[in-house]
Curated annotation (Swiss-Prot):
Gene3D superfamilies in UniProt: Exo84p, C-terminal helical domain, Exo84p, N-terminal helical domain, Pleckstrin-homology domain (PH domain)/Phosphotyrosine-binding domain (PTB)
Gene name in the database record: EXO84
GO biological process: exocytosis; Golgi to plasma membrane transport; protein localization; protein transport
Name the record gives this protein: Exocyst complex component EXO84
Family indicated by similarity: Belongs to the EXO84 family.
Lineage, opening ranks: Eukaryota, Fungi, Dikarya, Ascomycota, Saccharomycotina
Organism: Yarrowia lipolytica (strain CLIB 122 / E 150)
Keyword annotations: Coiled coil, Cytoplasmic vesicle, Exocytosis, Protein transport, Transport
Length: 657
């Protein structure tokens, strides 16, 4: 009796287990027609069926041992590639094992369809026949069905992506269309604004031309016959002064008594004039009389309108008579149309002039005239304050510079001619306008040069500042050029400031390069002696400071070694810097004397530390060896001071001498 194969279905198993059912099936079975492809099954007798049924019953009644059927594990086939990942995926999905109906295909067959099919199908040069042949060359029906399902899913996914891309492109198109429409509207509005701007500019030009022509007509009809503004040559100081003189002459001609208040002096001129004003009573705010305002660069003139009757022609004429005149520096001009926290009532188009406790109020019916007078007064007052401030500061600087240099240089105390010349050159600006390219220009250049020098000193660009001072300073006491004398005084002041900065750099413990640079500039400026003393004293203090930092912890040779290194190396570096900055041979004695004093200090320190130690001991000999080794470097800079060390290095020879 043969056993059924493992993959036999449950239905066939049940039919085999029931012999009666099996026999009935055999009886109902029609005999096969024998042809070329089928053979007729043999007939089974009753005995055979009974014998088979008994054998089947006996088989199912047998007890199967627990250890199972033994088999040879070595002959079992190997697991497919990727079986571990398949098992992990099944466990992760819920622990459901893979059933027999799900045929496990090898990764070699499934991988191209799963991973590479999408990319290959999207290529334009894809040969569908070749691709399908390669994919399904060794596939069974189930793999073909799986391949078809994947193609369908890929198609649906591509359709969805295409639809989504179409929607996205459509939305982008709508957005761009909206932006284009918005940009088009903005361009149209910008074009409209540009056209409006052009129209406004054209209108302004026309208004300016009309205003110019109307002003020229009004000036010809006004009481003051002022010259045409187009004929004024403001680029020439002489022409400008002539124009101002003509304006004053016209003012004196048409305003009676104006010459009494405003004598003709150079530089005085009319800034603005305005009619249609009324003087108000400061208590009742009622109009008193019509007035005419003339604002000059230094005065405010109020002219009253006086009516005269002509008996011959029986007509009344108006003439202007000077009524009030105040210096601008003595009055307080207030705009009553602006509130000032309750200090005065708000009166439209009105101004108030306060001088010496007397208040005069004036009002006009024309806002343009009010704005004209107020703006002109603010402009003149601002220029006046600026000029006064400049004059005051200039006088203070001049007085301080003269006092400073008179104190530092007694030879300048008797230069009264220089002070008088400076006073004359800094007098009224209108008196020196003819000499516009002469002395005034030189003083301006001096101020620019000094300002540039101050900037370089403030930025610590000392080399450039030194070059400027040496190029422009000329100590010629017999010179009659006032500007050169002023320049020399200011340059001497900046030179002292520069020297103070350089001396501070030398006195500070900085690098040898910075000290060498500062000493070189001081030598060029003529302060080499002062710099030499400061430098040598600074180096002496540095040696003492470094020596005090060395600690004596019982090791005498170690202490002497550190002190010797400090003394002799600093002496050597000081001598090197000194030789670079001071090349004159007669100054070599200064560094030699300084080095001698420092070596003597070291000898005293050596003797004090080794007091009581015999010269033939090892400690003493170690100190002598270290000192000789460090002192030998002084000969490299031309300093031979070995004779000063004989007292401690060779005490026996020193005692014999």
């Amino acid at each position: 009796m043969s056993l059924e194969p493992p993959n036999q279905s449950l239905r066939s198993h049940r039919q085999t287990a029931n012999p009666h059912v099996m026999a009935a099936a055999v009886q109902k079975q029609k005999p096969y027609i024998q042809d070329s492809t089928h053979l007729q099954l043999p007939n089974v007798g009753d005995k055979d069926r009974e014998r088979v049924g008994n054998m089947v019953k006996r088989r199912f009644s047998a007890r199967i041992p627990g250890q199972g059927v033994p088999y040879d594990a070595a002959a079992a086939p190997s697991l497919p590639v990727g079986a571990g990942s398949m098992i992990d995926d099944a466990v992760a999905a819920g622990g459901v094992p893979v059933t027999k109906s799900k045929t496990m295909t090898s990764p070699a067959k499934a991988a191209p369809v799963a991973s590479g099919a999408s990319g290959m199908l999207l290529k334009e040069d894809l040969d569908a026949h070749t691709f399908v042949t390669q994919q399904l060359a060794t596939s069974n029906a189930e793999e073909v069905d799986r391949f078809v399902s994947k193609l369908k899913s890929l198609k649906s996914r591509l359709v969805d992506e295409q639809r989504e891309a179409m929607y996205t492109n459509y939305n982008s198109f709508l957005t761009v269309n909206k932006e284009i429409l918005a940009l088009n509207s903005e361009v149209k509005s910008l074009g409209q604004a540009v056209s409006n701007f052009n129209v406004a500019v054209s209108a302004m030009v026309e208004d300016a031309l009309e205003s110019t022509s109307s002003k020229s007509q009004e000036s010809s009809q006004s009481s003051l016959a002022l010259p045409d503004s187009s004929a004024r040559n403001r680029n020439s100081m002489v022409m400008l002064e002539n124009m101002w003189a003509n304006e004053l002459a016209s003012l004196f001609k048409h305003v009676e008594g104006a010459v009494k208040y405003l004598p003709a002096i150079p530089g005085r001129h009319v800034v603005a004039e305005s009619g249609a004003w009324y003087q108000l009573n400061a208590a009742t705010w009622k109009p008193l009389r019509p007035v005419h305002m003339f604002l000059l660069n230094d005065h405010l003139l109020i002219a009253a309108k006086n009516r005269k009757k002509d008996n011959m022609q029986m007509q009344q004429t108006q003439t202007l008579v000077a009524d009030q005149c105040w210096p601008l520096s003595d009055i307080e001009f207030l705009d009553l149309s602006v509130s000032r926290r309750g200090t005065h009532p708000v009166v439209p188009n009105a101004v108030s002039v306060v001088c010496g406790g007397v208040t005069c109020v004036y009002q006009t019916e024309k806002p343009a005239q009010h704005a004209k007078v107020v703006s002109a007064f603010k402009k003149v007052a601002g220029e006046g304050r600026k000029n006064d401030t400049n004059k005051t500061q200039q006088q203070i600087r001049l007085r301080e510079s003269m006092t400073y240099y008179a104190a530092r240089n007694p030879s300048l105390r008797g230069h009264k001619e220089l002070l008088q010349g400076l006073s004359n050159s800094k007098g009224h600006s209108r008196s020196s306008s003819v000499d516009i390219t002469g002395r005034t220009k030189n003083l301006r250049e001096i101020d620019d040069l000094v300002n540039d020098l101050d900037v370089k000193i403030a930025h610590r660009r000392f080399a450039e500042a030194t070059d400027i001072i040496l190029e422009n300073i000329k100590d010629d006491k017999e010179s009659t050029d006032i500007t050169q004398q002023v320049l020399d005084i200011k340059l001497h002041q900046r030179q002292d400031e520069l020297v103070a900065h350089l001396i501070d750099d030398v006195a500070t413990d900085t690098s040898n390069t910075a000290v060498t640079h500062a000493l070189g500039l001081l030598v060029r400026l003529g302060h080499g002696d002062q710099a030499r003393g400061v430098y040598l004293e600074t180096r002496r203090n540095l040696i003492h400071k470094r020596t005090r930092q060395v600690e004596l912890l019982g090791d005498i040779p170690g202490y002497i070694a550190q002190v010797a290194v400090t003394y002799f190396r600093l002496i050597r570096s000081t001598a090197e810097v000194f030789r670079k900055c001071y090349t004159d041979n007669h100054l070599a004695s200064s560094i030699a004397e300084w080095a001698k004093s420092m070596v003597e200090e070291f000898v005293l320190l050596f003797a004090r530390q080794l007091y009581g130690v015999k010269p033939d001991t090892q400690t003493y000999q170690q100190c002598v060896s270290i000192t000789r080794q460090q002192a030998a470097q002084l000969s490299e800079v031309g300093l031979n001071l070995d004779y000063l060390l004989d007292y401690v290095l060779s005490p026996a020879r020193a005692s014999k001498a």
